[in-house]
Amino acid sequence: MTPKRPAVAWVPGRGDVIWIDHNPQAGREMKDHHPFVVLSTAGFNRSVGLVVGCAMTSAAYNRGSSLAIDLGPIPGRPDAHSFVLCHQLKSFDWKARGARPHPLARLDGDKLEQVLEIVGQILGFLP
């Protein structure tokens, strides 16, 4: 009889879209449960217990913003789009905030690269 392997605990990784609680918040920061795209690696997230990434929203006023990546229509809501807010870069204790996978699952390579490029420009890593 083959021994059962222990279940591998879920750890979010770069490009994953997760649900996370943004509260508490202040000022113009995102609040409540929202999707969040993870930019940090699974190894970092596992060892440090934090995720670094960007908030996501469906607020239409983000359309056309140079700081928001339009991911396209939301399934079942053709008039609403999902946006990654590259200027809402945050780190969260993903376990304490009850992070869980989002139905979008992952950003495709091109969209993730766009997010990383804008974040790099904001932080001065890229020209």
Which residues does each PLM region occupy?
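Conserved functional hotspots at enzyme active or ligand-binding sites that engage polyanionic ligands
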Residues: 1-127
